[in-house]
């Protein structure tokens, strides 16, 4: 009898433990503090980029709670594998050329990939595993380089395989996917001619093909200037002049119409904090010694917001706005959804643009195996929709997506497929189709545009 009672107590304890674990797991999916739960019709569907080896900046205190946006459209009827989203899905996909894109939706794009068929060898797909900066920690993790096509520097496997960014068919397919997602501006990761990141090769000569292909799909191209060796206010002045002189007359070159009615090129400056505000002010303030203001090379310059103190640095430097880039909520002050309302208030008070960056998830352990604490699971699209809702809550002029195809950090919305090789089992978008994140993006893009119309009334 005592034995039976003991077994019953153990069983009851296990049931309670399971229930507690499930409850705590569900708590991780709730909207961050300071954000409303998704409104009617916006229920979640069931469906870091930083210098390599650098430590993660600490997140700061949460901002004041944000006011919810106007009520969204009514929910769609869920099918057995789905649940409501911002708008009903099309019964039949529309022809790509007839699909509308929105210039207020930007996506970060990488053209650094190469394959033996085009370049004679793999580029970036064979990314090295970056060692941790602490040798003691680094010793516990694998080192070396990935070996495509079975072993990629990515936790997901692209539907196109380990492709070359120079392949015209790949470019056309990418533009098709961008258009399916309603993305109107491709933000191209850019290095000056003859320069590249540590794992890549120069690719400025590919820009004309990207512009030409984008133009065929009514997509525009903006530039995301990367932190190459020796970058400062003087070299960026030369970069801006080169980009505008070389590409500024192309029909796909993106220009943003500001509040004064002037159409100016828009540039994102990655890791802008590496240069002092005083140096940037030489370039970006009207009285700077080599100012581009009120010259043919004037533009809209968007700085990267990482730490809270960067807001004042960005203002003093003469930038026109700030973006957050990182797709890992909580990784930095800027990437934390709960801080976006405070950032938007600061920007509004100082005539700056705030461009929040949203992503479908984050996992870079294929190239930084020690960085699993920054992984953000996709939860079949829920993480992405939570980020999109957080962005719309602050009523931004533009929303940026991290990313279309940064495969190393697992932030891509590009189509991925299930894949198992002798050495790897890749993540995928199951139980949904490879186009899941393109479909979610279009649905939210259309909702974003409708919301903006209400904001302006």
From Swiss-Prot:
<keyword id="KW-0333">Golgi apparatus</keyword>
<feature type="topological domain" description="Cytoplasmic">
    <location>
        <begin position="1"/>
        <end position="8"/>
    </location>
</feature>
<dbReference type="InterPro" id="IPR026071">
    <property type="entry name" value="Glyco_Hydrolase_99"/>
</dbReference>
<feature type="compositionally biased region" description="Pro residues">
    <location>
        <begin position="65"/>
        <end position="87"/>
    </location>
</feature>
<feature type="compositionally biased region" description="Low complexity">
    <location>
        <begin position="53"/>
        <end position="64"/>
    </location>
</feature>
<dbReference type="Pfam" id="PF16317">
    <property type="entry name" value="Glyco_hydro_99"/>
</dbReference>
<dbReference type="GO" id="GO:0000139">
    <property type="term" value="C:Golgi membrane"/>
</dbReference>
<keyword id="KW-1133">Transmembrane helix</keyword>
<feature type="region of interest" description="Disordered">
    <location>
        <begin position="46"/>
        <end position="93"/>
    </location>
</feature>
<feature type="topological domain" description="Lumenal">
    <location>
        <begin position="30"/>
        <end position="457"/>
    </location>
</feature>
<protein>
    <recommendedName>
        <fullName>Glycoprotein endo-alpha-1,2-mannosidase-like protein</fullName>
        <ecNumber>3.2.1.-</ecNumber>
    </recommendedName>
</protein>
<keyword id="KW-0735">Signal-anchor</keyword>
<keyword id="KW-0472">Membrane</keyword>
<dbReference type="GO" id="GO:0004559">
    <property type="term" value="F:alpha-mannosidase activity"/>
</dbReference>
<comment type="similarity">
    <text>Belongs to the glycosyl hydrolase 99 family.</text>
</comment>
<keyword id="KW-0812">Transmembrane</keyword>
<feature type="transmembrane region" description="Helical; Signal-anchor for type II membrane protein">
    <location>
        <begin position="9"/>
        <end position="29"/>
    </location>
</feature>
<keyword id="KW-0378">Hydrolase</keyword>
């Amino acid at each position: 009898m005592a034995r039976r009672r003991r077994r019953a107590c153990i069983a009851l304890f296990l049931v309670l433990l399971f229930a507690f674990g499930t409850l705590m797991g569900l708590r991780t999916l709730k909207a961050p503090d300071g954000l409303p739960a998704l409104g009617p019709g916006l229920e979640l569907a069931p469906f870091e980029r930083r210098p390599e080896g650098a430590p993660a900046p600490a997140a700061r205190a949460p901002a004041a709670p944000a006011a919810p946006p106007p009520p969204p459209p009514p929910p769609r009827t869920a099918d057995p594998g789905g649940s409501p989203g911002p708008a009903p899905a099309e019964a039949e996909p529309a022809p790509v050329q007839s699909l509308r894109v929105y210039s207020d939706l930007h996506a970060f794009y990488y053209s650094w990939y190469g394959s033996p068929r085009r370049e004679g060898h793999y580029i970036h797909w064979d990314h090295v595993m970056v060692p941790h900066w602490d040798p003691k920690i680094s010793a516990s993790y694998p080192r070396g380089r990935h070996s495509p096509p079975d072993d990629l520097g990515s936790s997901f496997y692209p539907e196109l395989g380990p492709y070359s960014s120079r392949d015209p068919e790949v470019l056309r397919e990418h533009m098709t996917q961008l258009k399916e997602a309603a993305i109107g501006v491709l933000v191209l990761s850019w290095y000056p001619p003859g320069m590249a990141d540590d794992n890549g090769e120069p690719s400025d000569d590919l820009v004309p093909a990207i512009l030409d292909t984008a133009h065929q799909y009514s997509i525009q191209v903006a530039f995301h200037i990367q932190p190459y060796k020796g970058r400062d206010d003087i070299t960026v002045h030369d970069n801006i002049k080169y980009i505008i002189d070389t590409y500024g007359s192309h029909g796909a070159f993106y220009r943003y119409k500001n509040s004064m009615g002037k159409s100016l090129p828009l540039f994102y400056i990655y890791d802008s904090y590496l240069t002092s505000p005083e140096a940037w002010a030489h370039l970006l303030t009207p009285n700077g010694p080599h100012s581009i203001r009120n010259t043919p090379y004037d533009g809209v310059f968007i700085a990267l917001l990482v730490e809270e103190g960067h807001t004042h640095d960005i203002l003093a430097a003469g930038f026109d706005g700030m973006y957050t880039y990182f797709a890992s909520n909580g990784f930095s002050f800027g990437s934390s959804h709960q801080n976006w309302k405070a950032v938007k208030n600061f920007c509004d008070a100082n005539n700056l643009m705030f461009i929040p960056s949203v992503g479908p998830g984050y996992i870079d352990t294929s190239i930084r195996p020690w960085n699993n604490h920054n992984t953000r699971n996709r939860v079949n699209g829920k993480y992405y929709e939570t980020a999109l809702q957080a962005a719309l809550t602050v009523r931004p002029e533009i929303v940026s997506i991290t990313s279309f195809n940064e495969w190393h950090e697992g932030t891509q919305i590009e189509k991925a497929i299930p894949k198992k090789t002798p050495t790897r089992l890749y993540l995928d978008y199951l139980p949904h189709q490879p186009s899941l994140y393109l479909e979610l993006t279009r649905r939210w893009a259309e909702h974003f545009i409708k919301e903006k119309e209400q904001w302006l009334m």
